[in-house]
C-alpha cells in the first residue's frame, strides 16, 4: 500500500454540492457556494470578514497590498517556512528581513525585537507563519506589532483548525491567510482564504482580486488587479470540507500521538505551546536531537547560508521509505538559506538550520489507521537502526 504525506480526504457531500453547481450551470468564479464557503470560514474562525481566493499566496499578496506595502518597504517574515509565505513580498518589490525560529518552529520573539530595533527604517508589516499548525507566541508578538505600529499578517496556511487561548490562529493579526491546497488538512484542490478585521480593507482586496474593475457598464480600470477569485465548483468542495474540519483535526492529532508512542524512544517530538491546540497538519519528528542544542544566541547575518546538509540518517530514511512507497520529506529549508534570497537581511540563531538537518515530515493522511502508523514506524526504526 502506498502512503502519501497528506493526501486529500473527502467528507461525503463534495459530489452532492458539485452536482448542484453543475445543475445551476454556474461553474465560473464566484457564486452561491463561494459565498457559503466564506460564511463557513467566518463562522468557524469567528473572523469578521472572509474572502475566498485561488491560493493562500494570493491572500498574502492582497494583504500586503491593502496594508500599503510598496517598493523598498521592509517586511519582516518567518525564515523557517515555505517560499509561498514570503514570495508576495517580492511581488511588491519590498525588502524581506528574515527572522529565525524558537522551540515552537515559529518566530523567535527576541530576534524579532532585535530586527525591529536595528532596521534601517520602520518595518511596514510582519508575515508570521504558524508552521505545521503550531501556534507562535501570540501574546508577545501581537504586543510587539502594536507597540511598533507594524501590520501583523498571519500566514495560517498550515494552521486551519489550530487555536491559541481558544482563539483561531489567523485571527490575531489585521489579516490572516488559510490554504486549501491539495495537501492541506482540508482542501478545495487549490484555494485560499483571506480573513481580516477591517471590512473596508477586505473589500478592497476583493476588488483587486477581480481585476480591479470599476462599477461601470463597460470595463473601466483606474488601478490594476489580479485574477485571484475562486471557482464556484471549488467553493462547493470547500463547503463540504469545512463540515468535516473538526474531525480531521482530531484525527491528525491522534496520528501525531501514535507516532510519539511508536517512535518516542528514537525521535523527539516538539510539544505544543501552553494554552494552544495544534491541528498537527503534518507529524514531524527530530532525530538525535536535544533541546539544549537550541540556540538563543542572537546574530545578524546578511548572507545566505547555503551549505546546510541533511543528517545522514534522515537522508537514508527518506530514501528507504521511498522504496517502500512511503512519502516523507525533510522539514522546510529556511528562506535565508535559499539562493533566491541571497543577500537578504536575516536575524539568525541557527535553530531553523538544526531543524532542517534533523527533522522529517511523516505520512499524516487522515484516512490512516493506528495499524498503518505502526507498520510505517516499524520501517522507520528498521532504517535508522540498520
Swiss-Prot record:
**Cofactors, names only:** pyridoxal 5'-phosphate
**Matches recorded under InterPro entries:** DegT/StrS_aminotransferase, PyrdxlP-dep_Trfase, PyrdxlP-dep_Trfase_major, PyrdxlP-dep_Trfase_small
Residues holding substrate: 25-28, 56, 179, 227, 325-328
- EC number(s) per entry: 2.6.1.34
Pathway listed for it is:
Protein modification; protein glycosylation
Q: Which residues carry this modification: N6-(pyridoxal phosphate)lysine?
A: 184
Catalytic activities: UDP-N-acetylbacillosamine + 2-oxoglutarate = UDP-2-acetamido-2,6-dideoxy-alpha-D-xylo-hex-4-ulose + L-glutamate
Which top-rank group of organisms is this from? Bacteria
Q: What happens when the gene is disrupted?
A: Cells are impaired for flagella-mediated motility, for invasion of intestinal epithelial cells and for persistence in the chicken intestine.
Q: What keyword terms does UniProt attach to this protein?
A: Aminotransferase, Pyridoxal phosphate, Transferase
Which CDD domains has this protein been placed in?
AHBA_syn
Q: Which GO terms describe its molecular function?
A: pyridoxal phosphate binding; UDP-2-acetamido-4-amino-2,4,6-trideoxyglucose transaminase activity
Cite the effect that the entry attributes to residue 131 to F. Answer: Does not affect catalytic activity
Please give a single GO biological process term from the UniProt record: protein glycosylation
Its function, per the record, reads: Aminotransferase involved in the bacillosamine biosynthesis pathway by producing UDP-4-amino-4,6-dideoxy-alpha-D-GlcNAc (UDP-2-acetamido-4-amino-2,4,6-trideoxy-alpha-D-glucopyranose), a precursor used in the production of the glycan component 2,4-diacetamido-2,4,6-trideoxy-alpha-D-glucopyranose. Required for host colonization and virulence. Involved in the N-linked protein glycosylation pathway.
Q: Which family does it belong to?
A: Belongs to the DegT/DnrJ/EryC1 family.
Name recorded for this polypeptide: UDP-N-acetylbacillosamine transaminase
Protein's organism = Campylobacter jejuni subsp. jejuni serotype O:2 (strain ATCC 700819 / NCTC 11168)
